Amino acid sequence: MALDKSVILLPLLVLVLLVLGCLGRESRAKKFQRQHMDSGSSPSSNSTYCNQMMKRRSMTHGRCKPVNTFVHEPLVDVQNVCFQEKVTCKNGQTNCFKSKSSMHITDCRLTNGSRYPNCAYRTSPKERRIIVACEGSPYVPVHFDASVEDST
């Protein structure tokens, strides 16, 4: 009888653990927003912007993320890029899209000699067209691929 209960309870326990694991996992779309969206501010030449934001957005835990870009536009405008000019991603995938106009961004690059846990970044505000990879339903940005100068 005890064996019968174990046979029923073990798969149920595994199922519960799988569901709980999925609930706690950040979606790719949410990760994109955490790592790249800063709609509430404008690009800043403040030299500490990247140091503060990279730490605040959990990109300096366990290692220093070498490069990151923050976009200072409304989320809906960045989401709309998924329906603009289709381009090939750096990795060869075909789910990237380029914004039709320039956006305000801030590039953060790890400075030479900077090592974890003392991650130090160079802050570079720019106006560039952005390239993002999109997927899902709804179709939304899940990866920041690049920024390019506006050729117009």
Curated annotation (Swiss-Prot):
CC annotations in GO: extracellular region
Catalytic activity: an [RNA] containing cytidine + H2O = an [RNA]-3'-cytidine-3'-phosphate + a 5'-hydroxy-ribonucleotide-3'-[RNA]; an [RNA] containing uridine + H2O = an [RNA]-3'-uridine-3'-phosphate + a 5'-hydroxy-ribonucleotide-3'-[RNA]
Record-linked SMART domains: RNAse_Pc
Recorded superkingdom: Eukaryota
Glycosylation positions in this chain: 46, 112
Keyword Transcription included in the entry's annotation: no
Active-site residue numbers: 36, 143
PROSITE patterns: RNASE_PANCREATIC
GO biological process terms, semicolon-separated: defense response to Gram-positive bacterium
Record-linked Gene3D superfamilies: Ribonuclease A-like domain
GO molecular function terms noted in the UniProt entry: lyase activity; nucleic acid binding; ribonuclease A activity
Binding residues for substrate: 31, 34, 65-69, 90, 109
Keywords: Disulfide bond, Endonuclease, Glycoprotein, Hydrolase, Lyase, Nuclease, Secreted, Signal
Disulfide bonds: 50-108, 64-119, 82-134, 89-96
Location of the protein in the cell: Secreted
Subunit annotation: Monomer. Interacts with and forms tight 1:1 complexes with RNH1. Dimerization of two such complexes may occur. Interaction with RNH1 inhibits this protein.
Name of the protein this chain belongs to: Ribonuclease pancreatic
Species of the source: Papio hamadryas (Hamadryas baboon)
Gene: RNASE1
